[in-house]
């Protein structure tokens, strides 16, 4: 359904909307916004693409001497938030970032994904679909409304009350998401204490990434209302599972067919699917800095906590990087299991698409599927199967990122340079920090 300027003007009037959030995403994946009053004058500026902002203070955008940027709204992303306060109702729209010359800004992550989707269309595909599975933790707040490290419950996978104490919080999140147009498919407690997952229906990659950003905003807002802090940090607690964001991906052709499906193919998969998998495996080591972009991300990517460590693929086996869920036909998809929810979704999907399409374009052949538990294999067994490791640290991942031309071209020079610089600073800061583990292990020993 296409939303027009007239639809938005009518919404503003009929729903008594007082403020507009003009939302965009920085290179590190943080949702930003410029808020303006919902007056006729401001609406005119919005629809005429005349909303200007200072991009010099936004992570990875521009220098201070070239800071003027413009926000072009994608009207189809219009939402009216179902919460408000004494200052009035708030609505929002996701925007693309443009230069004063009217060109898409090279540092806009949403624009990066759109550019890669155009490259996909040139290869004859109509859409790249994503079904994300974002996980998050809920922590209690202290008397100053600051997050603690005390989880909200001691529940486990699919638990019910009384061990799952967040049922009402999740229900309100689901209700709000539904009001905003999401089709929520499942809501449940995850494996770790205090960990939760809410799954929503797949969509084309651009809409799915927009949904991820709005989803995070809703989860954090509703959690705070219930006296809790929601975090999408990959591994907030030692010794238990971390939070992932499995990405279920599929390509569709112009005639509406799933390009990954072939009933006569090996495992019910087409040659396109096998080549897409091969491309993902080929570039996995190099794109991991994008899909797992924080120091903490690599505390999750360790054996023993249901997170992938090894570059391989399988059918139902959940130990490799990639698996193919059992559904076939239009539901045929490839699930990449390494991504965590700290990733910038637009950049992550851009590099995953580029990697997969490299495999398709060059008709790469996927290696054998590994259906045995890789975690219990010896190093020699893994080597015999051609199984390699993902990067073990952010330092190694960032070092590998610029070495892959497919991945770097997907990102573009502006994003690549600014992302790498930010992550090198992050690693240097971490490397100099003296942790409690070091104190516990070395202070008395030496």
From Swiss-Prot:
Annotated localization: Cytoplasm
**Could you tell me what reaction this enzyme catalyses?**
L-glutamate + NH4(+) + ATP = L-glutamine + ADP + phosphate + H(+)
* Residue numbers binding Mg(2+) 1: 133, 246, 335
- Annotated disulfide bonds: none
The GS catalytic domain sits at 109-446
Cofactor section: Mg(2+)
Which keywords, in A-to-Z order, does the entry hold? Answer: ATP-binding, Cytoplasm, Ligase, Magnesium, Metal-binding, Nucleotide-binding
Q: Which GO terms describe its cellular component?
A: cytoplasm
Q: Which GO terms describe its biological process?
A: glutamine biosynthetic process
Regulation of protein activity = Inhibited by glutamine.
Q: Which Pfam families does the record match to this protein?
A: Gln-synt_C, Gln-synt_N
The residues the record assigns to binding L-glutamate are 241-242, 300, 306, 318, 337
How is the cofactor bound, in the record's words? Binds 2 Mg(2+) ions per subunit.
Q: Which EC class, in a word?
A: ligase
Instruction: Write out the residues that bind ATP.
Output: 185, 250, 318, 323
List each coiled-coil range: none
Assembly description: Oligomer of 12 subunits arranged in the form of two hexagons. In its feedback-inhibited form, interacts with TnrA in order to block its DNA-binding activity.
| Protein name from the UniProt record | Glutamine synthetase
Q: What organism, scientifically named, is this protein from?
A: Lactococcus lactis subsp. lactis (strain IL1403)
């Amino acid at each position: 359904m296409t939303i027009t300027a007239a639809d938005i003007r009518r919404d503003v009037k009929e729903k008594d909307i007082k403020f507009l959030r003009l939302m965009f995403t920085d290179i590190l994946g943080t949702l930003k916004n410029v808020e303006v009053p919902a007056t006729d004058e401001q609406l005119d500026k919005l629809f005429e693409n005349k909303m200007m902002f200072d991009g010099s203070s936004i992570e990875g955008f521009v220098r201070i001497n070239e800071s003027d940027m413009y926000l072009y709204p994608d009207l189809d992303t219009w939402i009216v938030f179902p919460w408000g306060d004494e200052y009035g109702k708030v609505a929002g729209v996701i925007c693309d970032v443009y230069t004063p010359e009217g060109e898409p800004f090279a540092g806009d992550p949403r624009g990066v994904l759109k550019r890669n989707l155009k490259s996909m269309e040139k290869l004859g595909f109509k859409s790249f679909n994503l079904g994300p599975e974002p996980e998050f933790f809920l922590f209690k707040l202290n008397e100053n409304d600051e997050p603690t490290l005390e989880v909200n419950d001691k529940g486990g996978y699919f638990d019910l009350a009384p061990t799952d104490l967040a049922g009402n919080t999740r229900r309100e999140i689901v209700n709000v998401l539904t009001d905003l147009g999401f089709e929520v498919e499942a809501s449940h407690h995850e494996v770790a204490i205090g960990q939760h997952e809410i799954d929503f229906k797949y969509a084309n990659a651009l809409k799915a990434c927009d949904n991820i950003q709005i989803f995070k905003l809703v989860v954090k807002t509703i959690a705070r209302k219930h006296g809790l802090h929601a975090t999408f940090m990959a591994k907030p607690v030692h010794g238990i599972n971390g939070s992932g964001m499995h990405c279920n991906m599929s390509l569709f052709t112009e005639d509406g067919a799933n390009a990954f499906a072939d009933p006569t193919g090996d495992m019910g998969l087409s040659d396109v699917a096998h080549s897409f998998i091969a491309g993902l495996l080929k570039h996995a080591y190099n794109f991991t800095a994008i899909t797992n972009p924080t120091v903490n991300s690599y505390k999750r990517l360790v054996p023993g906590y249901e997170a992938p460590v090894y570059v391989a693929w399988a059918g139902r086996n959940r130990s490799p990087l990639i698996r193919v869920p059992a559904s076939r036909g239009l539901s045929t998809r490839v699930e990449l299991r390494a991504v965590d929810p700290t990733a910038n979704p637009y950049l992550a999907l851009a590099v995953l698409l580029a990697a997969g399409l490299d495999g398709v374009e060059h008709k790469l052949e996927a290696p054998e599927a590994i259906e045995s538990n890789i975690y219990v294999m010896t190093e020699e067994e893994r080597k015999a199967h051609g199984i390699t490791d993902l990067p073990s640290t952010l330092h190694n991942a960032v070092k590998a990122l610029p070495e892959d031309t497919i991945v770097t071209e997907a990102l573009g020079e502006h994003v690549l340079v600014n992302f790498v610089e930010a992550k090198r600073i992050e690693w240097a800061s971490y490397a100099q920090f003296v942790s409690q583990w070091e104190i516990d292990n070395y202070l008395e020993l030496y």
